[in-house]
Amino acid sequence: MAKAPKRAFVCNECGADYPRWQGQCSACHAWNTITEVRLAASPTVARNERLSGYAGSAGVSKVQKLSDISLEELPRFSTGFKEFDRVLGGGVVPGSAILIGGNPGAGKSTLLLQTLCKLAEQMKTLYVTGEESLQQVAMRAHRLGLPTANLNMLSETSIEQICLIAEEEQPKLMVIDSIQVMHMADIQSSPGSVAQVRETAAYLTRFAKTRGVAIVMVGHVTKDGSLAGPKVLEHCIDCSVLLDGDADSRFRTLRSHKNRFGAVNELGVFAMTEQGLREVSNPSAIFLSRGDEVTSGSSVMVVWEGTRPLLVEIQALVDHSMMANPRRVAVGLEQNRLAILLAVLHRHGGLQMSDQDVFVNVVGGVKVTETSADLALLLAMVSSLRDRPLPQDLVVFGEVGLAGEIRPVPSGQERISEAAKHGFRRAIVPAANVPKKPPEGMLVFGVKKLADALSVFDDL
């Protein structure tokens, strides 16, 4: 008599599993997200054998002293894109598992195809496609004018078969496009389900560690822009990056959200052209492409992205509201942060906007999360309210507290130096960030309170 297939109940939100169904997940506290998954033992490969092969640890494990472990830096190889290397922490580490996500049409497959075509001339690579046919990939490579003579292609969705072929080919870098269409034979659920995504990602990660193959997995995203699939998917990989960009903009930003071999929140900027993605070596010049006409409601701030400063322009529009509840719209900034700053401006700046619609936008599609943009945002709103432009050679940064104090931000000297390189001659910064020796030809105003910043603005 055949044994009944094993059953498990898995949460679709976080990937936690349970022996029986329950209404609420105990891990993420979400309701009605637990579904049944049937598991059947593989008829040809025992579990211990499978774990000790492609997905398991090679050889016999042994205990080692931490002091005996070599401290030599892991060797890296370049992707051929300096911006991509920057986001990865300096290049690709052999044996690492990388997950790249992004909206449909952002350019994930294009970026990886360009990368592998460049690297195929120097080392052995393998591009595994599960969503497109080989003819479709070849047509895109031909349209972009990429060298394809040395690139190895494979159209397959079975993880076991892919690892068998990779064992024979022994590539240095392998791309899986995408992880949501891959499946394992001993998991009786459809590709893209929580169980399939979790097990296939873990299988590939262990294969990368034991064989020294760098694997890049393409992942889908949800409606809110986060990576689809269980959270355990992001836990088991070494590096998670997200390729983002508006549909009406040709610029794409690549940002690292997790990196075991480098800095997180590192930013790389690309431009989508007819020849594919091209890296932008000086992003500040693009985000600051302003016209000669001076307009109110515009200010320039210096944000810190990963390991480098970036100059971006923030725009604000304050107009009389025709509705009982004025609108507050923030694009590229946190909505709650805008509400806090409006309250601080009313309480400590004496300017109330309760009857005004307020719209703010970060130019270029950049998403700013750090609080160093507070002071620039406030001055942009005041500029729009008074219809008085800020000087074009003025740069602003600083955090604003609830008591109206201007708090210092990290790397103040580097931010000021970056602004001076781009021709800015005046700066309003926190008093604690004023350098002992400002850049030549630059006038730096240090402020401690919001009232001080408004006073400097009046005197400009």
Swiss-Prot record:
Chain ranges of zinc fingers (C4-type): 11-28
A single GO molecular function term of this UniProt record: damaged DNA binding
Region (Lon-protease-like): 357-460
Alphabetical keyword list: ATP-binding, DNA damage, DNA repair, DNA-binding, Hydrolase, Metal-binding, Nucleotide-binding, Stress response, Zinc, Zinc-finger
tRNA-binding in keyword set: no
A Pfam family the protein falls into: AAA_25
Record EC number: 3.6.4.-
Superkingdom as given in the UniProt entry: Bacteria
A Gene Ontology biological process term: recombinational repair
UniProt cross-references to InterPro entries, sorted A to Z: AAA+_ATPase (IPR003593), DNA_repair_RadA (IPR004504), P-loop_NTPase (IPR027417), RecA_ATP-bd (IPR020588), Ribosomal_Su5_D2-typ_SF (IPR020568), Ribsml_uS5_D2-typ_fold_subgr (IPR014721), Rubredoxin_2 (IPR041166)
List of residues binding ATP: G102, N103, P104, G105, A106, G107, K108, S109
RadA KNRFG motif (motif): residue ranges: 258-262
Similarity field: Belongs to the RecA family. RadA subfamily.
Record comment regarding domains: Has a putative N-terminal zinc-finger, a middle region with homology to RecA with ATPase motifs including the RadA KNRFG motif, while the C-terminus is homologous to Lon protease.
UniProt function note: DNA-dependent ATPase involved in processing of recombination intermediates, plays a role in repairing DNA breaks. Stimulates the branch migration of RecA-mediated strand transfer reactions, allowing the 3' invading strand to extend heteroduplex DNA faster. Binds ssDNA in the presence of ADP but not other nucleotides, has ATPase activity that is stimulated by ssDNA and various branched DNA structures, but inhibited by SSB. Does not have RecA's homology-searching function.
Protein name according to UniProt: DNA repair protein RadA
UniProt source species: Salmonella typhimurium (strain LT2 / SGSC1412 / ATCC 700720)
